[in-house]
Amino acid sequence: VIRSLVVNNNSEEALENIGLKITFEPEFAKEFTYHIGSIPAKSSAEISPVRISTNTDLLFSLTEKMVGNITIEVLQNGENIFTYQNTIELLACDQWSGLNIMPEMIAAFVTPNHPALSPVIHDASTFLKKWKGDPSFTGYQTNNPNNVKLQMAAIFAALVQQKIVYNDPPASYEIIGQRIRLPHKVLKQKMGTCLDLAVLYAACLEAVGLHPLLFFMTGHAICGCWLENETFADCCVDD
């Protein structure tokens, strides 16, 4: 929530017995207090990291985006000498914030260990057995890009069997974000946006030891995969 804080003393005298208090409205995190002590004249004190303990029950209960408030107070001898307030957006647990703010957070919705994927992977293995006589997913062990393509195709074929219906995402979703259906919802509801389906496919690929990629363009998202045992150095790359 807060990485670090710097308290500046711009006066000509040292400030003694200085403390910090951070409160949250609604209480999506516990009140944070910190004793700084003395700040010399024309100096500053940095608090890093700021160890905020979040209220997971409240955050998981959110069903829509809401705006919260953060209040930071600087105290001297327990009395307020400075107050700073700002707002923060709180998202429901299935909301992605879009490309404008930490786009790499989309990776949190790729869930290769989700139990709903097991039947899909099992169905995909039957396609592998039919095509090459071996149902095993070997990831990159063979160092053969064509084998990786076969594994990708098998998972894709298994997902096609699910008869999932495509539905349009919200306008400008890639910028402002959207609600994302996790695998169990897509497979149960039999529908999903391009991002829902891309995230589902990526989860299946990662579940069998492959390295998926998510590509975003105006109004659309697609999933790809490395054909070699490689990854980008950075989690988010602009083209």
Feature map (PLM): residue ranges:
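Secondary-structure boundary elements
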Residues: N113-Q189
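Short, hydrophobic/aromatic beta-strand segments
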Residues: E12-K21
